[in-house]
A protein has these predicted regions:
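Conserved consensus positions within extracellular tandem repeat modules
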Residues: 3-5, 32, 42, 51, ...
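An edge-strand/N-cap motif at the start of beta-rich repeat modules
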Residues: 3, 7-51, 57, 65-66, ...
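Extracellular calcium-associated, cysteine-rich motifs in secreted modular proteins
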Residues: 1-25, 284-366
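Short glycine/serine- and acidic-residue-enriched loop/turn motifs that recur at repeat junctions
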Residues: 48-60, 87-98, 123-134, 160-171, ...
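Conserved core positions of repeat-based scaffolds
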Residues: 35-38, 46, 73-76, 86, ...
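Repeated scaffold domains used in trafficking and secretory/extracellular systems
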Residues: 64-68, 101-105, 138-140, 175-177, ...
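Glycine-centered loop/turn positions within well-structured domains
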Residues: 6, 34-35, 52-53, 73, ...
């Protein structure tokens, strides 16, 4: 894998860059219910509906290593001790104790994390969702509204509420990845995506998919990233499954009630319900892996991994600083009066309007 932590930044780049770490994701988006938070360049930015303070994270000690949004709370693994910090509704009661965490999942009313001791959960336990069963070398944990799942050396185990079958794991062949929605669960195994639990709107009926790289489940829909891009299924009341925008190399996906967000080469993109702020990614969000001061959010930086370049006027793959013909009109910049406009190259009077459009080429007023 050339991107072990799945943050969209190649391992080779992270190994040589300042303040980037190949051992954990430097960039991550996490959505739940009606809000999302983004881990970016060591800080957490949140947006959406702030019912219980869930989009108002406290100041987190660096480095922030992991981020997960729950029903009305959010959590992160932060500081050098790798402890879990939560905020929002009943945050302290939903914060697993201990240090050394490297994986985290916030559910509806509980939170689970993985450290060297295994899986630890905290929060509401009305269905046994925080009573962790015996697990062997767990590598991933996921949390729904009232149930939890883990992937360990023996496969997938789920516990907690099971009224829709969300904790009854079917037969799986070499499972590699898990994800949990409000009351349904999915895994990626050798056959593709396998789902179980509540199947309203066919959210637990995945299409045939291959080469699955990432999986995300929401309350009413599900999505997966494959080599061909993002595929979604389930409820489409707000076009969250059918109107997938154009995405440049999506690497991570996260879902809420009626929203979907993806981390791409051009930053975070969200879609679905647009009647409030839940899909409105803040313009202030900074994603700047090459630390050149130009964000890649929205594709502003055409060269997010090259601090010496930010702009490519003619889209030829060569940055303007190195390109001898920025606008690609066949006239070198040294001889082009309008090096950033391919429509003309002569501007006799230097007024910024090329002679082809200028009604007074020499600027003499006539």
């Amino acid at each position: 894998d050339t991107d072990d932590d799945g943050d969209g930044v190649a391992d080779t780049f992270e190994s040589s860059a300042d303040n980037l770490d190949v051992s954990y994701a430097d960039y991550r988006v996490s959505s739940q219910y009606d809000q999302s938070c983004v881990l970016s360049d060591g800080s957490v930015t949140c947006f959406g509906i702030d019912d219980q303070g869930e989009i108002s994270p406290p100041t987190l000690s660096s480095p922030v290593r992991f981020l997960s949004m729950g029903g009305y709370h959010g959590c992160a693994i932060a500081d050098s001790d790798q402890a879990i910090t939560c905020w929002g509704e009943n945050a302290s009661a939903r914060t697993p104790s201990g240090t050394g965490y490297y994986e985290l999942a916030a559910g509806g009313y509980h939170t689970c994390g993985i450290n060297a001791s295994g899986v630890s959960c905290a929060g509401t336990n009305d269905y046994g969702q925080t009573t962790t069963p015996t697990l062997t070398k767990p590598v991933q944990v996921a949390a729904g509204t009232h149930h939890s799942c883990a992937l360990d050396a023996n496969g997938v185990t789920c516990w907690g509420r099971n009224d829709s079958g969300q904790s009854t794991v079917p037969s799986l062949t070499n499972p590699k990845m898990i994800a949990v929605g409000a009351n349904h669960s999915c895994a990626v195994d050798d056959t593709g995506v396998v789902c179980w639990g509540d199947n309203a709107s066919n959210k637990a009926t995945p299409p045939a998919l291959t080469n699955i790289r990432q999986l995300g489940l929401g309350s009413h829909h599900s999505c997966a990233i494959t080599d061909s891009g993002v595929n979604c299924w389930g409820d489409d009341a707000y076009s969250q499954t059918s109107s997938i925008p154009s995405l440049v190399n999506p690497v991570q996906i996260s879902l809420g009630n009626s929203l979907t967000c993806a981390l791409t080469d051009q930053g975070v993109v969200c879609w679905g319900y647009s009647g409030d702020a839940r899909t409105s990614v803040p313009s202030s969000l900074s994603i700047d892996p090459d630390r050149d001061g130009v964000t890649n959010q929205g594709g502003v930086d055409a060269f997010p991994f090259d601090a010496s370049e930010t702009t490519d006027t003619d889209s030829d793959g060569i940055g303007n600083n190195a390109d001898t013909d920025d606008d690609g009109d066949g006239v070198t910049d040294a001889s082009d009066d309008l090096p950033l406009s391919a429509s003309d190259y002569i501007d006799t009077d230097g007024d910024g309007t090329g002679n082809l459009m200028d009604t007074d080429d020499d600027g003499d007023g006539t």
